[in-house]
């Protein structure tokens, strides 16, 4: 079976790395990024303990390679911006091992090392054709503007992210749900003197700052703030003055951690990445089982619990595990994958929505956060971090 993979982010790279040695399958990946891309842009992310467990169980990537470019995620602090602590959760109370804190550029470097030899770069998907035998033929545009075809495939894998071109071609633009939250992200370099350490969230009403330390004296900061509507984030919110209003209490001072973050907000306001929190409808396969979707291309979700890249890792390794069972057709691959992953993904999406309560209008950041350190939420976290599929 000849498999083509569109996109070599987290899900695509891991799938290619795990699948390329499985007997009976030929895997070829394509990515629009240039060959030998060494982009140092991007911010940071946390990877949940469930992704690490999936790698221990199913292989596909060296955990030592990931740990060498990351820091452990052991604690989950929730406080108010004035310094009042609400909870301080030890992840080992709900997981078998800590998660990871890592820069996106470092994560991509590690995962793409497993897929680079099977990837053609500088290929941007433009269209999809079908040969006389019903196999799919992707049409790519190269850097010089020409259109190229790299042969026919029995199965195509959409691993090209939230705005997947392959998903759009086979199923249209997915419907998005917006909960009314604006976000920004920032990577601060040369931050050795920062008071920020492990994963922390700091609330002021329904606005929240999130931060954690990363390797190489970097700190990741993200802000979430109420923002109704859809479309791009309006310019009037993209000022230090407007953002400070969200995170400074009406009375009293802020904690040293928050003061440091606000000072970086003032300095780097023009360097931030802005977006609206959103999720899309889940789609595991299309075209009667000739297209399989992984990661954000299949089920982009709210980022509240940091499960985007984590579930992409689970997806990739689960899909490779299906191939090891030697399915006899592309449709069998897709059906087996959906049966394995459907309930798991829906659970992760539901829990992520539930955890977003403190960011929504009317949500109580204190009561809602306290509930996250108690049952039944702790039991759901254990299920999230322990029951990989």
Task: Label every model-predicted segment.
Residues 20-41:
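Glycine-rich FAD pyrophosphate-binding loop
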Residues 85-90, 94-108, 142-148, 189-274:
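Conserved FAD/dinucleotide-binding core of flavoprotein oxidoreductases
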Residues 163-164, 183-185, 207-210, 298-299:
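Histidine-centered metal-chelating micro-motifs
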Residues 34-54:
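Conserved N-terminal glycine-rich FAD pyrophosphate-binding loop of Rossmann-like flavoproteins
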Residues 5-18, 22, 157-158, 184, ...:
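Conserved mid-domain beta->alpha element of the FAD-binding
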Residues 374-389:
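C-terminal auxiliary extensions adjacent to catalytic cores
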Residues 11, 35, 163:
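Conserved Rossmann-like nucleotide-cofactor binding loop
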Residues 1-6, 48-187, 241-244, 386-389:
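Conserved N-terminal helical subregion
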């Amino acid at each position: 079976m000849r498999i083509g993979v569109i996109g070599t982010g987290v899900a695509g790279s891991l799938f290619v790395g795990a699948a390329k040695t499985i007997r009976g399958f030929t895997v070829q990946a394509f990515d629009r990024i240039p060959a030998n891309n060494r982009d140092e842009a991007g911010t940071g992310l946390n990877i949940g303990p469930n992704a690490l467990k999936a790698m221990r169980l199913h292989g596909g990537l060296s955990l030592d390679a990931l740990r060498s470019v990351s820091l452990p995620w052991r604690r989950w602090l929730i406080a108010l911006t004035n310094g009042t602590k609400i909870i301080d959760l030890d992840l080992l109370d709900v997981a078998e091992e800590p998660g990871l804190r890592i820069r996106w550029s470092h994560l991509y470097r590690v995962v793409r090392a497993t897929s680079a030899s099977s990837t053609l770069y500088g290929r941007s998907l433009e269209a999809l054709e079908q040969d006389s035998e019903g196999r799919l033929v992707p049409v790519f545009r190269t850097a010089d503007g020409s259109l190229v075809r790299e042969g026919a495939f029995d199965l195509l894998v959409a691993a090209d992210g939230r705005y997947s071109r392959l998903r759009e071609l086979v199923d249209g633009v997915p419907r998005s749900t917006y909960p009314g939250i604006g976000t920004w992200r920032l990577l601060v370099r040369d931050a050795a003197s920062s008071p920020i350490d492990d994963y922390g969230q700091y609330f002021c009403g329904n606005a929240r700052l999130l931060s954690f330390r990363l390797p190489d004296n970097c700190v990741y900061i993200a802000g979430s703030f109420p923002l109704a509507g859809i479309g791009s984030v309006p310019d009037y919110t993209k000022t230090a003055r407007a953002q400070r209003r969200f995170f400074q209490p009406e009375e009293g001072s802020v904690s040293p951690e928050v003061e440091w973050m606000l000072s970086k907000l003032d300095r780097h306001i023009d360097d931030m990445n802005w977006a609206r929190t959103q999720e899309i409808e889940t789609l595991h396969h299309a075209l009667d089982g000739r297209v399989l979707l992984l990661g954000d291309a299949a089920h982009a979700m709210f980022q509240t619990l940091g499960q985007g890249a984590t579930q992409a890792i689970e997806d990739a390794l689960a899909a490779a595990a299906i191939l090891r069972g030697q399915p006899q057709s592309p449709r069998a691959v897709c059906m087996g994958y959906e049966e394995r992953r459907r309930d798991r993904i829906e659970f992760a999406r539901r829990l992520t929505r539930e955890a977003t309560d403190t960011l929504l209008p009317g949500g109580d950041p204190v009561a809602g956060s306290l509930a996250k350190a108690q049952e039944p939420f702790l039991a759901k976290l254990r299920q999230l971090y322990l029951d990989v599929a």
